[in-house]
Regions:
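Non-catalytic alpha-helical scaffolds and adjoining flexible linkers that form interface surfaces
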Residues: 1-14, 21-204
Length: 204
């Protein structure tokens, strides 16, 4: 079985509870002496086996790291791990999932070695927002309900508002709407990408 590690939680001295996103589930497993295994870090893709335990959580066994070359680059790894942490907070408490969550991570991980990490992550996020029906397709400010003009600001969840209402940096409305439609950052300048990343860090 394969999955992405979204969170690890230390218990006792060296044991870990790990949360792993697989094709259709968010699994919670237990690993004895998990802190001794450097592979058990947020964002890692692993192959593993699950061993049932009638008294406690299922155990994580026979771990194999399915690594990527970009994991050696600290900046790419940082952005990736941050996105995985945000995704876990969004999915926490859910057990069964549509495969799009795993597939989006898998696709993004394959792109990360060749593309700008923030562009990859923002496109992943837009893909998931679109799947969840959360990409805004109406042309009004969520704070005052008045029509949006050429410039907009983004709140958590990429909800649109007037810059004067939200008191934050303005972005071009047409570019943001194109990003929502295509889930592609190709038309966005790097400064706009960085602003979207700052908004994403507020949470899913």
């Amino acid at each position: 079985m394969q999955g992405f590690l979204l969170q690890t939680q230390s218990i006792r001295d060296e044991d870990l509870i790990v949360h792993i996103l697989t094709k259709n589930q968010l699994k919670t497993l237990y690993r004895f002496y998990g802190k001794r295994h450097s592979v058990l870090n947020v964002g890692r893709k692993i192959d593993f086996e699950e061993e049932n335990d009638d008294k406690f959580l299922p155990k994580l066994r026979n771990i194999l790291h399915l690594g990527y070359l970009w994991e050696r680059e600290m900046e790419r790894l940082f952005f990736w791990q941050r996105f995985c942490t945000l995704l876990f907070k969004h999915l926490e408490g859910v057990h069964s999932l549509d495969s799009i969550y795993f597939d989006t991570l898998d696709d993004g991980a394959n792109k990360l070695s060749k593309q700008h990490p923030l562009r990859v992550i923002l496109e992943m996020y837009a893909t998931l927002l679109n799947f969840e029906g959360r990409l805004q397709n109406y042309n009004s400010c969520f704070l005052c309900d008045a029509k949006l003009e050429r410039s907009v600001a983004l709140a958590q969840g990429f909800i649109l508002a007037h810059p004067s209402c939200l008191k934050t940096k303005s972005l071009d409305l047409e570019k943001i709407q194109a990003f929502f439609r295509t889930q592609s950052t190709i038309d966005l300048e790097i400064e706009e990408v960085e602003e979207l990343w700052r908004t994403l860090n507020l949470g899913f």
